[in-house]
Amino acid sequence: SVKQSNLDFRTREAYKMLRTNIEFSGDNNKVIFITSSTPSEGKSTVSFELAMSFAQNGMKTLLIDADTRKSVMKNRGKKGKIKYGLTHYLSGKNELKDVICVSDVPNFCMIFAGPVPPNPSELVGNDRFAKMVEEARATFDMIIIDTPPIGSVIDAAVISKVCDGGILVIGAGDISY
């Protein structure tokens, strides 16, 4: 089970607008990675809320927490309900069906990060990650992948190879021009 957010009307509408922009950006944009330049810019929140927006719009949606070093998504799961995660699958300990957490929110499933591995970049770059995304493409209408910040580690660039598009989240007020 997953804890939902209580968003105000304007915030919920902003996520709907982002969802609609993705839907109209092309026919084959099924797998989207979300990253940021630095930690604490809100990419995990955007990933979660965007995935929720797709699910609430009737699309079977999978959110993958690929930020295995510093996952904040584990706080979204209800205590005691998360058994296995992405790192269990990528290291060959579990099958994909074992790590997908089916939510009580219709059309919303999630893969939590799992325990911190000693070699995160190598794990997301291995064949099992690409195989997982291909399998998920056959089952889900939309796949959102929350990745580590691109300015900190290489994981997001490695993950982007199996994605159709990406979103760079920038913290509000962090950039001046």
Language-model features, listed with the residues they occupy:
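P-loop NTP-binding module
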Residues: 2-177
